[in-house]
């Protein structure tokens, strides 16, 4: 079932924190996409989001109203108008990199492959440009072909390769460095 039409995309709010944390944890525990293998503690996540909100950093969430199945709930996913995906750009803190941001994003498995990632990243990059950033960077595991295709589709280019840049479950993985000029 295509659920993209029932999904809303909007800026993250304090009300999204717990749902965002649950979704982040589901994606992290897949051990295939993020730099961490489980979500940070809820209070760390809360501090990150509240800081993003306070500074006006681009952070958008995809939410859905009550269409997540019972099987997804038992797998740790969420119900209600809750977060099913996110995309954020956090500006770098050093003065010479103040024009740069770092992109992070994720989607619950059931919501992948339906164009939602494109909607999220497009909205977030537009907000990053409006925020004053002129460069956005990301890293992605080399075997994450669908994410790489998405990033290339919206204009990211490969700038480098970190050989054996990640070690997960005893297996090394290459990390691709990508960026887009806004």
Task: Annotate each language-model stretch with its function.
Residues 7-20:
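A short beta-loop-alpha structural element at the N-terminal edge
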């Amino acid at each position: 079932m295509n659920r993209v039409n029932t999904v809303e995309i909007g800026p993250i709010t304090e009300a999204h924190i717990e749902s965002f944390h649950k979704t982040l944890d589901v994606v992290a525990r897949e051990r295939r996409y993020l730099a961490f293998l489980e979500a940070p503690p809820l209070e760390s996540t809360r501090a990150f989001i509240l800081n993003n909100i306070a500074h006006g950093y681009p952070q958008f969430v995809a939410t859905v109203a009550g269409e997540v199945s019972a099987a997804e709930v038992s797998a740790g996913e969420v119900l209600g108008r809750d977060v099913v995906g996110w995309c954020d750009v956090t500006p770098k803190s050093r003065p010479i990199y103040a024009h740069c941001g770092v992109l992070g994003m994720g989607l619950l498995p059931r919501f992948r492959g339906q164009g939602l990632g494109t909607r999220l990243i497009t909205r977030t990059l537009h907000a990053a440009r409006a925020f004053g950033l002129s460069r956005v960077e990301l890293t992605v595991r080399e075997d994450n072909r669908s994410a790489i295709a998405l990033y290339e589709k919206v204009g990211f280019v490969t700038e480098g390769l970190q050989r054996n840049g990640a070690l997960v479950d005893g297996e090394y993985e290459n990390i691709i460095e990508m960026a887009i000029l806004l």
